[in-house]
Amino acid sequence: MILGIGTDLANIERIARTLDRFGDRFRNRVFTDIEQVKAERRKDVAGTYAKRWAAKEACSKALGTGLAMGIAWKDMSVTNLKSGQPVMHVTGWAQERLAAMTPPGHEAVIHVTLTDDHPWAQAFVVIEALPLKS
């Protein structure tokens, strides 16, 4: 069963300007260490950050709260499997919200997809509840 769906569109050029203006202050407020290492190794640094920004916004929407209701930016983190597939991790209040919205006898699975076509980065997040295996 679907528990939540969220999407977001981020402007890569806006993220690039924010990185230029605020640098580490912005990076450290929004992105985990793992996300920063990944982004800084990429040719398109701003695009990588923009996709993760969009993923966090989309996840907060799928959780039904948005970022205004206590979820911190770093409560959500995007990593990648070796195949390149993005994976959303939640901690803190985001994890608490996910647990609260998951029906008994189910486990929540967060699906995330990222794309970009300059100057836009987009993310979709679907939160699904799957029955626990006996």
Swiss-Prot record:
Keywords: Cytoplasm, Fatty acid biosynthesis, Fatty acid metabolism, Lipid biosynthesis, Lipid metabolism, Magnesium, Metal-binding, Transferase. This is Holo-[acyl-carrier-protein] synthase. NCBIfam families: acpS, pantethn_trn. Belongs to the P-Pant transferase superfamily. AcpS family. It comes from the Bacteria. SUPFAM superfamilies: 4'-phosphopantetheinyl transferase. Mg(2+) binds at residues 8, 57. It catalyses: apo-[ACP] + CoA = holo-[ACP] + adenosine 3',5'-bisphosphate + H(+). Its EC number is 2.7.8.7. GO terms for molecular function: holo-[acyl-carrier-protein] synthase activity; magnesium ion binding. The gene is acpS. One of its GO terms (cellular component) is cytoplasm. It is an enzyme of class 2 (transferase). One of its GO terms (biological process) is fatty acid biosynthetic process. Transfers the 4'-phosphopantetheine moiety from coenzyme A to a Ser of acyl-carrier-protein. Transmembrane segments: none annotated. InterPro entries: 4-PPantetheinyl_Trfase_dom, 4-PPantetheinyl_Trfase_dom_sf, ACPS, Ppantetheine-prot_Trfase_dom. It is found in: Cytoplasm. Its cofactor is Mg(2+).
